């Protein structure tokens, strides 16, 4: 459940008013912190926000005073400083752990007891828990063996390196922990909030796996103590000979380990509070055992304990099979053989055949614990690494060896090495003994002052444990015989725990103490690991783990406990403590490495929010700690290190792939920002090299009234061009003012982002609010991008229905867009019939992408189909390139040159040269030009005032009447409908009908009248300031004259304009129309069935009076083609033949 805190504002007059109901109305709880079931977000449902954010505190919304009346209207968003400070000062966070369980059990009758504020100090809250978690099974079961194998010098270096690693990590952790209020949840929250959801999830799961395998290691240590030192007779599997003892022991570990794991998981499931209450008992066992070791060291200096060991030559003998360390014994006056004789000879008789080594060497007995004053430290100073199956021998003892290659009988009672040892292996086995430094930060919610207690308690605990470990290395080497140290299971000292032989007053103190301490550590791991997994699951950054965020009603992570037990069982099935230890070393080292990385990144970035209260840190220390962790990972086991890093990398990429939506203000985001800033500043130094040129797209989309993208196919096409690996900015313009339309802009931006995510477009979204569309588009073109990372290509759709639009600003905006991209040296891509472009799910199984290379304005025409064919939609389409040859061109040579050029460009395409001979301008072209100019003339009239328009139309009518007497009427008529303005405007009536030529094959457009039988569009318009133009096509192919359609609206005047003489037409327009018609004929002939046609887009006229003619040219050029992309280069894009 969520915890809410209440900030109460009292009038300054009376403190007794707090009992008044009126004063209680100032206590306002944040509704976002009300109890709820499905807690999402930061993974800690009991954490209220400690950040200074006015939206998090609704205190002060009811204001009665007059002193601050100037700010009374802003009280809903800006609370009073007094209430804010009160809320921050009283901020508390409950611990994550067994508190939920205890609270649920203490709640009776639906009433909750008031939650006591945490009162734990540094000693009880941090120091002792860290001691309990750091001291563990390795200290009691393996440290003596490590010292015996590696020697005092190498063991000292090993312990020093490992302790330095944890000390440097603790310094980094202290800096992170004191950088603000520490939320309950500990190390995972510090890492995830410092490094972001991707690293946080990856490292959090590695930390969870490490904690889980630590539980397996503690359970295996418990079983080893139980079967090897407490109750050896409990072993289920017995070895028939010495060679089978190791396998039998592993099977016993698996069986008993599974049973102990089941019991521990049941205890954790039933009553977690008992685990926490017995934690001090387990800690007492650890401290008592360590004190017993030091007491034994002191006693051994003047009164060494009696633990004799038996040597045959220089070989160590196991005490399991005999009692007297001698070959012969005296019984009365008779010499008899001992049990040791029987182990090496065929019988107990003196004349029996005995082992050759046994015959040649004497049996001697020495003290296993000579004591600190014995000077043994010199002998144990250097290493004695062993291979598996080798007998443990004492250096310096006389021995008569055997011939080389003589096999050793494994049934003889020697002490054998059970594994091959080397330095890196010992590091992996030893390192888990220094883990557990996060115990204090994990209890941050219990602490009175976490920012003070965590650094002090953790560093003191590490210093204490490091001193114990380093001193133990020296003392073990100074007090215990080397062969005993190398005897892992104490076979030479009657099966006693080696470290127990040094303890005072009895070895049983160590045995029993270590047994309970390992049990307690295992229970703690099974308690903490599920809660860590629950926190990760509740964060929601790893979707498939969200089921483990649920649990019992009291908050216990039932499902997480079940998964933890299953993973822990994997470690138990491994069954070897020496094999499990390096595994958890990997996961803990990776966690510590990222703690150091987080501190180093935050320090180097110097973000304003990085203000740790702990001052004794530096980025060099964090970097050294990170490097040490990484080195130790590969020193311990390079293949385990690679596996751990692979697991973390897969988790990272999975979280990144699924889209981590958490924003925690983490250091990696800051690192990305700094890297982006550095890269952008580098890009500012100069334009990109030719080889680095790639299309950086600015996609201009239009949104409807509901802020949804009108043509999503534009973004599909953008996604299909993603092989360019360039920048993508999707922009849109909303008309209006920023103050009024800001919410709509936000909705439009969200809608565009959703569509970008659906179409898998990687890029940015930018919505601009402007008083008019023209200025907004211009702002986007000018200001899109940042620094050197700016767009160089604009992708826009062709303005549909531009003829029909009463507001002719639509196509004027488009032409201005073309001019601005040309002025800015930007490439322009215009998609015509964009609704017919394929979506990403579609696939073309055949077809072609046809490129009509008419003029060379850069390499865009070649590059675009190359990029498109990398996408699954266009992959099976072949590429065809057409170029146009004039009369004086050698078409054969042109084809060869183009083929060679494509070969050097590494582009595969079919090449064809189309010959377009000069021909006379057809009557069809003249008629198209005539219609275009008449329409242009009428469009100009629409921008005149009423009186100017009437005078202009009258002059056209008079001119037309004169033309009728000279020319025959044509078959298509033009009717101008002028709405009725006033009564005085209805004086003149048209004297006669004027008919103009309009070819039947002219391209249909939205402004064309429908076919006969359909109502023409727009006849009901009555806008008094507009003239409506209606074209009516011929009904018959015989081009018979057709009478005018009746006028339905009253008061409408029909004015007719007769076509001017053909010789009066603008010859430039005629030539351009001729080019458009001829090119269109050629393109349609060759590319009618192409899946996509790309061709050069001609530029707009320099004289703005011909803008509407430009639109007509483009319409004629692209008619009867399904999918067209007009490409206009900016002059900077280049496709190069060089590598």
Swiss-Prot record:
Positions of disulphide bridges: 310-325, 345-354
Record-listed K(+) binding positions: 113, 410, 446
Composition skew (Acidic residues), residue ranges: 982-994
Catalysis: reaction(s): K(+)(in) + chloride(in) = K(+)(out) + chloride(out)
Reported regulation of activity: Inhibited following phosphorylation by OXSR1/OSR1 and STK39/SPAK: phosphorylation takes place downstream of WNK kinases (WNK1, WNK2, WNK3 or WNK4) in response to hyperosmotic stress and subsequent cell shrinkage.
Topological domain ranges for the Extracellular compartment: 121-129, 204-229, 277-402, 454-485
The keyword Membrane is annotated on this UniProt entry: yes
Listed Low complexity bias regions: 1003-1012
A single BP term in Gene Ontology: multicellular organism growth
Scissor helix: annotated segments: 667-681
Glycan attachment positions: 314, 333, 351, 362
GO cellular component: cell periphery; dendrite membrane; glutamatergic synapse; membrane; neuron projection; neuronal cell body; perikaryon; plasma membrane
Cytoplasmic-side positions: 1-98, 152-174, 421-429, 514-534, 579-592, 633-1139
Region spans: Disordered: 1-62, 95-116, 943-1025, 1033-1052
Family of this protein: Belongs to the SLC12A transporter family. K/Cl co-transporter subfamily.
Name used for this protein in its record: Solute carrier family 12 member 5
């Amino acid at each position: 459940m969520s915890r809410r805190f209440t900030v109460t504002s009292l009038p300054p007059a009376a403190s007794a008013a707090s009992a008044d109901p009126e004063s209680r109305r100032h206590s306002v709880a944040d509704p976002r912190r009300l109890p709820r079931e499905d807690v999402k977000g930061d993974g800690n449902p009991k954490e209220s926000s400690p950040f200074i954010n006015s939206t998090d505190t609704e205190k002060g919304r009811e204001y009665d005073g007059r002193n601050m009346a100037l700010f009374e209207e802003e009280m809903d968003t800006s609370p009073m400083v007094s209430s804010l400070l009160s809320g921050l000062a009283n901020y508390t966070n409950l611990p994550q752990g067994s508190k939920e369980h205890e609270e649920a059990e203490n709640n009776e009758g639906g009433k909750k007891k008031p939650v006591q504020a945490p009162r734990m100090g540094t000693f009880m809250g941090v120091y002792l828990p860290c001691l309990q978690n750091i001291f563990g099974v390795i200290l009691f079961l393996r440290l003596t063996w490590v010292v015996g194998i590696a020697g005092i010098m190498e063991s000292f270096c090993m312990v020093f390196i490992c302790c330095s690693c944890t000390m440097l990590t603790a310094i980094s952790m202290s800096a992170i922990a004191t950088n603000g209020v520490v939320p309950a949840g500990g190390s995972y929250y510090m890492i995830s909030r410092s490094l972001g959801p991707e690293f946080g999830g990856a490292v959090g799961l590695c930390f969870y796996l490490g904690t889980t395998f630590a539980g397996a290691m503690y359970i295996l240590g418990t079983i080893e103590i139980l079967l090897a030192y407490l109750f050896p007779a409990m072993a289920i599997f017995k070895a028939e000979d010495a060679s089978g003892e190791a396998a039998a022991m592993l099977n016993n570990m698996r069986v008993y380990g599974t049973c102990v794991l089941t019991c521990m998981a049941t205890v954790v499931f039933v009553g977690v509070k008992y685990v926490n209450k017995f934690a001090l008992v387990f800690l007492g066992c650890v401290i008592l055992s360590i004190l017993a070791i030091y007491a034994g060291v002191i006693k051994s200096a003047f009164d060494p304990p009696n633990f004799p060991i038996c040597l045959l030559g220089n070989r160590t003998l196991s005490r399991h099979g005999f009692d007297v360390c001698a070959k012969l014994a005296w019984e009365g006056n008779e010499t008899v053989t001992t049990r040791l004789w029987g182990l090496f000879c065929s019988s107990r008789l003196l004349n029996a055949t005995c082992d050759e080594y046994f015959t040649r060497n004497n049996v001697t007995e020495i003290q296993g614990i000579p004591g600190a004053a014995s000077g043994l430290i010199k002998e144990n100073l250097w290493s004695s690494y062993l291979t598996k199956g080798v007998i443990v021998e004492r250096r310096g003892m006389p021995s008569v060896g055997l011939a080389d290659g003589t096999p050793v009988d494994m049934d003889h009672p020697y002490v054998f090495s059970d594994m091959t040892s080397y330095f890196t292996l010992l590091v992996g086995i030893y390192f888990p003994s220094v883990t557990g430094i996060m115990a204090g930060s994990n209890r941050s919610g219990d602490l009175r002052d976490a920012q003070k207690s965590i650094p002090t308690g953790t560093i003191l605990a590490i210093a204490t444990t490091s001193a114990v470990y380093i001193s133990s290395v020296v003392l073990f080497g100074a007090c215990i015989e080397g062969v005993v140290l190398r005897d892992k299971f104490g076979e030479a000292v009657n099966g006693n725990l080696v470290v127990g032989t040094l303890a005072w007053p009895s070895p049983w103190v160590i045995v029993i103490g270590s047994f309970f301490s390992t049990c307690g550590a295992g229970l703690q791991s099974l308690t903490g690991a599920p809660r860590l997994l629950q926190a990760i699951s509740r964060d929601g950054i790893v979707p498939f783990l969200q089921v483990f965020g649920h649990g019992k009603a009291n908050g216990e992570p039932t499902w997480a406990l079940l998964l933890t037990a299953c993973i822990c069982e994997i470690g138990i099935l491994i069954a070897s403590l020496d094999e499990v230890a390096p595994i958890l070393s990997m996961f803990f080292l990776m966690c510590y490495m990222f703690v150091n990385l987080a501190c180093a990144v935050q320090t180097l970035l110097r973000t304003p929010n990085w203000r740790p209260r702990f001052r004794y840190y530096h980025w060099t220390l964090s970097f050294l700690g990170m490097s040490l962790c990484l080195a130790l990972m590969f020193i311990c086991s390079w293949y385990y290190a690679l596996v751990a890093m692979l697991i973390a990398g897969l988790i990272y990429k999975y979280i990144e792939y699924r889209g981590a939506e958490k924003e925690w203000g983490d250091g990696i985001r800051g690192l990305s920002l700094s890297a982006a800033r550095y890269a952008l500043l580098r890009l500012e130094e100069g334009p990109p090299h030719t080889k680095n040129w790639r299309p950086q797209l600015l996609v201009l989309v239009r949104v409807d009234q509901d802020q949804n993208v009108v043509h999503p196919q534009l973004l599909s096409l953008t996604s299909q061009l993603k092989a360019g690996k360039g920048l993508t900015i999707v922009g849109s313009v909303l008309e209006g003012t920023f103050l009024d339309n800001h919410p709509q802009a936000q909705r439009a931006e969200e809608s565009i982002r959703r569509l970008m995510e659906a179409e898998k477009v990687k890029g940015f979204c930018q919505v601009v609010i402007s008083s008019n569309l023209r200025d907004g588009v211009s702002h986007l073109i000018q200001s899109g991008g940042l620094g050197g990372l700016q767009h160089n290509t604009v992708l826009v759709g062709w303005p549909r229905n531009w003829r029909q639009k009463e507001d002719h600003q639509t196509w004027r905006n488009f032409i201005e867009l073309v001019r601005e991209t040309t002025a800015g040296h930007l490439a322009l891509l215009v998609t015509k019939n964009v609704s017919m472009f394929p979506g990403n799910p579609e696939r073309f199984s055949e077809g072609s992408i046809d490129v009509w290379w008419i003029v060379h304005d850069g390499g865009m025409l070649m590059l675009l189909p190359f990029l498109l064919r990398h996408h699954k939609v266009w992959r099976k389409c072949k590429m065809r390139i057409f170029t146009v040859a004039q009369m004086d061109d050698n078409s054969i040579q042109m084809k060869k040159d183009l083929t060679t050029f494509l070969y050097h460009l590494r582009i595969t395409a079919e090449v064809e040269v189309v010959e377009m001979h000069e021909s006379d301008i057809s009557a069809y072209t003249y008629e198209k030009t005539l219609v275009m100019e008449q329409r242009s003339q009428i469009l100009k009239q629409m921008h005149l005032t009423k009186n100017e328009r009437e005078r202009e139309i009258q002059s056209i009518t008079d001119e037309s009447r004169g033309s009728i007497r000279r020319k025959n009427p044509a078959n298509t008529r033009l009717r101008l409908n002028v709405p009725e303005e006033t009564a005085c405007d209805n004086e003149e009536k048209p004297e006669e009908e004027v008919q103009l030529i309009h070819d039947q094959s002219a391209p249909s457009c939205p402004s064309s009248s429908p076919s006969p039988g359909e109502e023409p569009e727009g006849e009901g318009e009555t806008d008094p300031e507009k003239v409506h133009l209606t074209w009516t096509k011929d009904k018959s192919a015989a081009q018979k004259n057709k009478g005018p359609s009746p006028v339905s609206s009253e008061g409408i005047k029909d004015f007719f304009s007769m076509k001017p003489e053909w010789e009066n037409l603008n010859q430039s327009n005629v030539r351009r129309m001729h080019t458009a018609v001829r090119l269109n004929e050629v393109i349609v002939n060759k590319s009618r069935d192409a899946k996509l046609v790309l061709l050069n887009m001609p530029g707009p006229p320099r004289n703005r009076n011909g803008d509407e003619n430009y639109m007509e040219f483009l319409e004629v050029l692209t008619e009867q083609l399904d999918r067209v992309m007009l490409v206009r280069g900016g002059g900077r894009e280049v496709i190069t033949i060089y590598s």
